[in-house]
From Swiss-Prot:
It is found in: Cytoplasm. Its EC number is 6.1.1.4. It catalyses: tRNA(Leu) + L-leucine + ATP = L-leucyl-tRNA(Leu) + AMP + diphosphate. Transmembrane segments: none annotated. A motif ('HIGH' region) lies at residues 41-52. The keyword Transcription does not apply. One of its GO terms (molecular function) is aminoacyl-tRNA deacylase activity. GO terms for cellular component: cytosol. HAMAP family: Leu_tRNA_synth_B. It comes from Staphylococcus aureus (strain NCTC 8325 / PS 47). This is Leucine--tRNA ligase. ATP binds at residue 580.
């Protein structure tokens, strides 16, 4: 059996594409455009795994397909190369993260090139390249000038043993993931970006995007907009006020106590001497827990009384003020009014600590449980007898009259904590002067370079390792002689990935982020494919920066990514997640070696729908390779010449299946239905094997449809068909509607209602001809022998019924 040599063919065409810069994107600003984007990878030490190429193959198929349709296609690749793993490696080994990162990028790039993706490598970006992060810093300065970047005291995860601040992901059950050391919440000065200012726009503009609804919902929930009221409770015997946000101001007559977060600014000043020790001990315990642990619905409620009281602004009743860790300082105002009769969590708390439960909505039995349903208000003064909506409106009115509250919209979304106490990130371009002022680094001095250092180690104070580098930190103003200290925090890994899709449009521009004309031509991104794990943060942060740049008239669109698609996860053979510990990780290098890149690409697209989670299967991989071998054998003789089966005359036998194939593959490519497109290509090849001759233009059309999926074999077969130039820019095949249907139909012939024959006839056969054909059929003749024909009924294209006695 003759099979093709994938190693030889794939290397040959990859070299050809490289030498000829086949996929170089020109900036023909008048041509119709298509921008296909992959989520660029973090170049880890482990290299590419088989999950990466799934999304990359999908965008590559679309890019190749669109080029053949005459589009100007932008399809770039780059590296999201700052981040913790490289820093961790540097801390563990003493090596420079630059070296580590450079080596990893080389591996990733080699692996990606071996898969035959049609990237324009002249547009490659790397977030750790000073020429790139110059513009990341420039965007930060624009945010700062617009009042969207500010310094705030924020509680962070401080790990004294490691001498550093950890992200929430690095803390598990109150200890560090690495080494298992205790972690405490400690307030530190941090840079924060005011994403909340854009909350409404980020919410509203989701409606115009072609994104999966489930993903839009994740963003909506993360933003978490709710309407309600802000209510003030005066604290007895002090000037203090406790402000709460509630979506149910109508239940205020049932507010029988207040709960503050242990970190709330008022706690220490209102706590009475008698309760000070208990409160202090509780605060310390709470500082060891993550937000997730604190808000776990299943956990036992804990809390302590502060000894202080406040006054309910509508009922005038005195209410106790407690602290409890299930209230977070970061949500709302960091305080809640507890209405135990109508809220499950408050009910549990009130029962545990024997606090009053006042029913204000009828319909439940508050002796047994909180009632959270609808109903008429009772025990509520002027609100009595009103239903929910009317009562909410009235309650806000009453609060406003007393100056004790107002209507308010609240967001679950918090401002974005933007500093990291790390070395391997973009330096934040800010100087703190000794007179207490701060300024940004002048734009003409950007990029502010990350200093090279022999020793990356935690500062021990919670600051970043940059704090140890005096030559970086200390500055003197040349004009005034004033001393200053540079900001030592660095930006999070999200920063570089917030805008990389803009830099691809004009990656070598030294004077601006990108040329406005080019931005106008290429934006928005037409198709963005990546994993669902970035559904919230990366996409929300990128949308936020894009909206700021839109307001600054730097980008011409309100949204960056018009259509977004999440590929599914490729699981191990036993339907488990691939992981090093399970030893079920599959390295694409091995597959490329054994089966070829085209087989890997075809298989990953054929496994199932692009967004489904599917288990890897060696059998499936072998099946994909067998299909490519069948295609090869159909067209190529043992000696490598073109098969004589391929002819220049059309005997029409493949008209229907060819035209159906072009229609189906074209429609499926448009909807990313690659698995069903491949099935149809297989149907076509099966039909080709059943006939003696195959019409050459049909085979050429087939090769054009196969090439985006399996580009190396596509190019090789195209050249075997006698073409000198690459298949890349050949026009996409078209189909003829008229040939999608058969010229022939099958009719049934019945004698006295019993089936006697099935006969193929031309579609336009007349009734008379149908009768003649039926009566001359041997089976029919045998069954009417010796009988009189009473009548013959013919239904065109369907049946002939003969009644005989």
């Amino acid at each position: 059996m003759l099979n093709y040599n994938h190693n030889q063919i794939e290397k040959k065409w990859q070299d050809y594409w490289d030498e000829n810069k086949t996929f170089k994107t020109n900036d023909n600003l008048g041509q119709k455009k298509f921008y296909a984007l992959d989520m660029f990878p973090y170049p880890s030490g482990a290299g590419l795994h088989v999950g990466h190429p799934e999304g990359y193959t999908a965008t590559d198929i679309i890019s190749r397909y669109k080029r053949m349709q005459g589009y100007n296609v932008l399809h770039p690749m780059g590296w999201d190369a700052f981040g913790l793993p490289a820093e961790q490696y540097a801390l563990d080994t003493g090596n420079d993260p630059r070296e580590f990162t450079k080596k990893n990028i080389q591996t990733f790039k080699r692996q990606i090139k071996e898969l035959g993706f049609s990237y324009d490598w002249d547009r490659e970006v790397n977030t750790t390249d000073p020429e790139y992060y110059k513009w990341t810093q420039w965007i930060f300065i624009q945010l700062y000038n617009k009042g969207l970047a500010y310094v705030d005291e924020v509680a962070v995860n401080w790990c004294p043993a490691l001498g550093t601040v950890l992200s929430n992901e690095e803390v598990i059950d109150g200890v560090s993931e690495r080494g298992g050391h205790p972690v405490y919440r400690k307030p530190m000065k941090q840079w924060v970006l005011k994403i909340t200012e854009y909350a409404d726009q980020l919410l509203a503009d989701l409606d115009d995007l072609d994104w999966p609804e489930s993903l839009k919902d994740m963003q909506r929930n993360w933003i978490g907009r709710s309407e309600g009221a802000k209510v003030s409770f005066d604290v007895d015997n002090t000037e203090g006020k406790v402000e709460v946000f509630t979506t149910r101001p109508d239940t205020i007559y049932g507010a029988s106590f207040l709960v503050l977060s242990p970190e709330h600014a008022l706690v220490n000043s209102i706590t009475t001497d008698e309760y000070k020790e208990k409160v202090k001990a509780y605060q310390t315990e709470a500082s060891k827990k993550s937000d997730l642990e604190r808000t776990d619905l299943a956990k036992d409620k804990s809390g302590v009384f502060t000894g202080a009281y406040a006054t309910n602004p509508l009922s005038g009743e005195k209410v106790q003020i407690w602290i409890a860790d299930y209230v977070l300082s970061t949500y709302g105002t960091g305080a809640i009014m507890a209405v135990p009769a109508h809220d499950d969590r408050d009910y549990e708390f009130a029962k545990k600590f024997d606090l009053p439960i006042i029913e204000v909505i009828e319909g439940g039995n508050v002796e047994e449980a909180a009632y959270t349903g609808e109903g008429k208000h009772i025990n509520s003064g002027e609100l009595d007898g009103l239903e929910n909506e009317a009562a909410i409106t009235k309650a806000i009115q009453l609060l406003e009259q007393k100056g004790a509250g107002e209507k308010k919209v609240n967001y679950k979304l918090r401002d974005w904590l933007f500093s990291r106490q790390r070395y391997w990130g973009e330096p934040i371009p800010v100087i703190h002067w000794e007179d207490g002022t701060m300024t940004t680094v002048p734009e003409e001095e950007l990029p502010l370079l990350l200093p090279e250092t022999d020793e990356i180690k935690p500062s021990g104070t919670g600051e970043s390792p940059l704090a140890n580098i005096d030559s970086f930190v200390n500055v003197v103003d040349e004009k005034t002689g004033m001393k200053g200290r540079r900001e030592t925090n660095t930006m999070p890994q999200w920063a570089g990935s917030c805008w990389y899709y803009l830099r691809y449009i004009d990656p070598k521009n030294e004077n601006m982020l990108a040329d406005p004309e080019k931005l106008k031509h290429w934006l928005p991104v037409d198709l963005y494919i990546g994993g669902v794990e970035h559904a919230v943060l990366h996409l929300l942060y990128a949308r936020f920066w894009h909206k700021v740049l839109y307001d600054l008239a730097i980008v011409p669109t309100k949204e960056p990514f018009q259509k977004l698609f999440n590929q599914g996860m490729i699981l191990g053979e036993g339907n488990e997640k691939m992981s090093k510990s399970k030893g079920n990780v599959i390295n694409p290098d091995d597959i490329v070696q054994s089966h070829g890149a085209d087989t890997l690409r075809l298989y990953e697209m054929f496994m199932g729908p692009l967004d489904a989670a599917i288990a890897w299967s060696e059998k499936g991989l072998d099946g994909s390779r067998r299909f490519l071998d069948r295609v090869w054998r159909l067209m190529v003789n043992e000696d490598g010449t073109l098969s004589s089966k391929i002819v220049t005359t059309n005997n029409k036998s493949l008209d229907k299946v060819y035209n159906q194939t072009v229609k189906k593959v074209t429609e499926d490519f448009e909807t990313l239905g690659f698995n069903t497109a491949i099935s149809q290509l297989m149907v076509f090849i099966n039909e080709c094997y059943k006939v003696d001759e195959v019409y050459k233009p049909y085979i050429e059309g087939f090769v054009k449809m196969l090439a985006p999926i399996a580009p190396h074999i596509g190019e090789e077969l195209w050249s075997k068909l006698g073409h000198e130039e690459s298949i890349t820019y050949q026009p996409w095949p078209t189909y003829d509607e008229a040939l999608l249907v058969d010229d022939e139909v099958e009719i049934v012939v019945q004698v006295n209602g019993k089936l006697r024959a099935k006969i193929k006839i031309a579609k336009d056969t007349s009734k008379e001809e149908m009768q003649e054909i039926a009566l001359s059929n041997d089976n029919v003749k045998a069954s009417i022998e010796g009988k009189d024909i009473m009548k013959v009924i013919a239904v065109p294209q369907k049946l002939v019924n003969i009644v005989a006695k």
